[in-house]
Amino acid sequence: MKRTYQPSKLVRKRRHGFRARMATAGGRKVIAARRAHGRKRLSA
């Protein structure tokens, strides 16, 4: 059986990167919440 996690830097950036987050209203809320929490890393 193939494992579910097949790492790819490109797919990781496209799905969870900063620009992907900023592209949607929900994603912007995620960034805002992480900023409010004082996260060192906001996105992948």
Curated annotation (Swiss-Prot):
One of its GO terms (biological process) is translation. GO terms for cellular component: ribonucleoprotein complex; ribosome. PROSITE patterns: RIBOSOMAL_L34. The keyword Glycoprotein does not apply. InterPro entries: Ribosomal_bL34 (IPR000271), Ribosomal_bL34_CS (IPR020939). Keywords: Ribonucleoprotein, Ribosomal protein. It holds the Pfam family Ribosomal_L34. GO terms for molecular function: structural constituent of ribosome. Coiled coil: none annotated. Transmembrane segments: none annotated. The keyword Ribonucleoprotein applies. Belongs to the bacterial ribosomal protein bL34 family. NCBIfam families: rpmH_bact. HAMAP family: Ribosomal_bL34. This is Large ribosomal subunit protein bL34. It comes from Methylorubrum extorquens (strain PA1) (Methylobacterium extorquens). The gene is rpmH.
